[in-house]
Design a protein with these regions (language model features):
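Conserved Rossmann-like nucleotide-cofactor binding loop
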Residues: 51
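Short SAM/SAH-binding signature in class I
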Residues: 84-91
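Class I S-adenosyl-L-methionine
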Residues: 3-5, 77-78, 95-227
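Glycine-rich SAM-binding Motif I of class I
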Residues: 28, 32
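Conserved alpha-helix/loop element of class I SAM-dependent methyltransferases that forms part
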Residues: 2-17
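Conserved SAM-binding motif I beta-strand of class I
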Residues: 42-47
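Conserved class I S-adenosyl-L-methionine
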Residues: 17-26
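S-adenosyl-L-methionine
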Residues: 54-82
Length: 227
């Protein structure tokens, strides 16, 4: 099964020779490709439900690869730190991903794991969580798939809490010079501007209005809208 554009991007971010943990593996298409391509030397593939793991098991048997270990568990609860150096959490909401990271205390222990994260919703909340918990977002790439825009980000724990402007949580390190990056940032701009427009003229909502107005102005500058 050929990988989707989104999964291809995720696979490209995996370091060569990695020991990967793929959370919420579903059909195990990504782990199979990582082993076949030689990107990963071993993959632990987890899912919280038995049915997806059964589908994964069938696909792994068909593929002929043997370096994939399937585990039924919630997030990283059945994974030891010594077993992995790269963790993929994709296809879930930003708040769900934050919860999985938060419960795996060993992600904050040396040697640090590379996190490859692809939220389907609330990417701004995931970025906010990462920054608040001393993770550095090392890359942030926008990708369009089936008419939807996603961000795929990499992060690593540093132990250093940094200060970032509010708009960073909405656009991260996405490059506006790429086509998908431009449209991703444009979407966030329109969202912030729409909120500001809806709140304009409401005295009891002045604080929220000013927040979204400033947010849209900062994001707009990234797109050279000149606000």
């Amino acid at each position: 099964m050929p990988l989707s554009l989104r999964l291809k991007l995720i696979a490209s971010l995996v370091p060569d020779g990695a020991r990967v943990c793929d959370i919420g593996t579903d059909h195990a298409y990504l782990p199979i490709e990582l082993i076949k391509s030689g990107k990963a030397i071993r993959v632990i593939a987890t899912d919280i439900r038995e049915k997806p793991l059964e589908n994964a098991r069938k696909n792994i048997r068909k593929s002929g690869v043997t370096e994939i270990d399937l585990r039924l568990c919630d997030g990283l609860s059945a994974v030891e730190k010594s077993e992995t150096d790269s963790v993929i959490i994709a296809g879930m909401g930003g708040e769900v991903i934050s919860g999985i990271i938060s419960r795996a205390k060993w992600l904050k222990e040396k040697p640090y794991n590379l996190l490859i994260l692809q939220p389907t919703t609330s990417p701004e909340e995931l970025r906010r969580f990462l920054i608040a918990n001393c993770f550095e977002i090392t890359s942030d790439t926008a990708i369009s798939e089936n008419g939807k825009l996603y961000s795929v980000m990499t992060a690593v724990f540093t132990g250093n809490k940094i200060s970032v402007p509010e708009y960073f949580y909405y656009v991260g390190k996405v490059d506006p010079k790429t086509e998908d990056g431009f449209f991703y940032i444009q979407k966030q701009y329109r969202r912030a501007k729409s909120c500001a427009d809806a709140l304009f003229g409401l005295p009891e909502k002045k604080t929220e209005y000013l927040h979204f107005k400033e947010l849209s102005e900062h994001i707009g500058r990234l797109l050279n809208y000149g606000e």
